[in-house]
A protein has these predicted regions:
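Juxtamembrane intracellular "pre-TM" segments in multi-pass secondary transporters
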Residues: 1-13, 188-221, 396-403
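Helix-loop junctions on the cytosolic side of multi-pass membrane transporters
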Residues: 127, 169, 173-198, 379-392
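Transmembrane alpha-helix termini and helix-breaking/packing motifs in multi-pass membrane transporters
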Residues: 32-41, 93-96, 151-171, 239-244, ...
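Loop-to-transmembrane helix entry/capping segments in MFS-fold secondary transporters
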Residues: 45-46, 131-141, 326-336
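C-terminal transmembrane bundle of multi-pass solute transporters/carriers
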Residues: 51, 55-71, 76-85, 92, ...
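A single, central transmembrane helix in multi-pass transporters
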Residues: 21, 25, 29-33, 163-170, ...
């Protein structure tokens, strides 16, 4: 599969894509509205950052207890059901006078539900397109996410200014419900990829199996930690520029879009393989300039250039998919998503804490420096893994009896 037109001619790709697009727009609009609401109520950079990214902390609970559900639930019902629950939760958060602690309780509950939702969605995408089409399909989803964020943050900023954060939350809830309806009507019923009931024991066994490969382990860490630390920088946009945060979010999304187009469509596989680490360094380096507290114009340029580096995720994902056993696609990709979102939540909390003690600009600089340090630490391990297994597809040693996940190959 080599062209975008082939993707959209593939049955079920379009409804899955449209549902994800609506859900991303809803998340973007609601995140900005909720952060504005919390900042106005508390004047706290920490709570503001946590309102946008803190729910991701629930992902660590889901990744260690519920992730086996990613291959054991019917995909259509799960994708549409999660979007519906997010719509209801967003309506609840728009209730006037709702205490901040109740808002955070709802956010954490939704984060727990989403902990296996990513695995269901990406496992379904891998099933629809098969491995040879996964990178191109994922790049389209990433580009869509960038465009939806550009539109969502720009529209969200206007809506919050013209209407109110609570009205904006209600509009976002409508987008979530539209996403649920699109998935319900557009996807066909499929049996779960695995038999048996989800369980904590299955989740732990499969996580251990995936982490048994040093190369997979390094790839997971590269997908989780450097990117997550930079998301900690992004979580401080509202605190750094309260009235212009939408501008920074929109330019960051535009940079991410450019990075995904370049990585997924323009680079050859050979060149792409060499740019994983440089892109991760690019992702963090421009944020070091925030130590100078630049104005909104320079800040927007910095976040645009930095966000091109998010193209590194596609490069690492391509390598990870080649190393995933066929019978673990949903769980393995869900582990990637859950770990990524968990690290985003942890980083938002860390960045918010540093900003409370110092300033948002200082915190952004510290998080960027930490991201660069982690990338440089992990890079040698990835190069050693590549030298030991150059350009190969994964050959999995069968798991011992009792520990093999009972998953049917897609």
């Amino acid at each position: 599969m080599r062209s975008y037109s082939e993707l959209f001619r593939t049955r079920e790709f379009t409804p899955l894509f449209l549902s994800a697009c609506l859900r991303t727009a809803a998340s973007t609009v609601s995140g900005l509205a909720l952060a504005t609401l919390v900042y106005r109520a508390t004047q706290s950079p920490l709570l503001t950052a946590l309102s946008m990214f803190g729910p991701s902390l629930a992902q660590v609970v889901g990744a260690t207890t519920m992730l086996s559900a990613a291959d054991r639930l019917p995909p259509r019902a799960t994708v549409s059901g999660i979007a519906f629950l997010f719509g209801l939760g967003t309506v609840a958060m728009a209730i006037p006078g709702l205490p901040v602690w109740v808002i955070f309780a709802l956010l954490l509950l939704l984060g727990l539900v989403q902990s296996f939702g990513g695995g269901v969605q990406w496992g379904l995408l891998n099933e629809i397109l098969a491995k040879e089409g996964y990178l191109l399909g994922r790049s389209v989803f990433n580009m869509m996410s960038g465009l939806a964020q550009i539109t969502g943050y720009a529209a969200g900023g206007v809506l919050v200014a013209l209407l109110s954060p609570r009205v904006t939350l209600l509009l976002a809830a409508g987008l979530y419900l539209a996403s649920a309806l699109t998935a319900r009507l557009g996807l066909t019923p499929r049996v779960p990829r695995a038999s048996g009931r989800p369980s904590i024991a299955r989740t732990w066994r499969t996580n251990a199996r995936l982490f048994s490969s040093p190369e997979r382990r390094t790839l997971y860490l590269l997908l989780w930690v450097p990117n997550g630390l930079v998301v900690g920088c992004e979580s401080l946009y509202v605190s750094y520029a309260p009235s212009r945060a939408g501008v920074l979010f929109a330019f960051a999304a535009f940079g991410m879009f450019l990075g995904d187009v370049t990585t997924g469509r323009l680079l050859t596989p050979r060149v792409r393989a060499r740019l994983g680490i440089p892109f991760l360094l690019l992702l963090a380096a421009p944020y070091l300039l925030f130590v100078l507290r630049p104005g909104i114009g320079v800040a927007a340029a910095c976040v645009t250039v930095a966000s091109v580096g998010f193209g590194s995720s596609l490069i690492q994902q391509e390598r990870l998919v080649a190393l995933i056993p066929d019978d673990l696609s949903g769980h393995a990709l869900g582990l990637h998503t859950a770990g990524m979102l968990t690290m985003q939540g942890v980083s938002a909390a860390l960045a918010g804490g540093v900003a409370q003690l110092a300033s948002p600009a200082t915190a952004m600089t510290v998080m960027a420096a930490a991201s660069i340090a982690v990338t440089l630490t992990l890079a040698p391990s990835l190069r050693r893994g590549s030298a030991a297994s150059p350009a190969r597809q994964h050959r999995e040693v069968p798991a011992p009896n009792g520990s093999q996940s009972q998953v049917n190959s897609p």
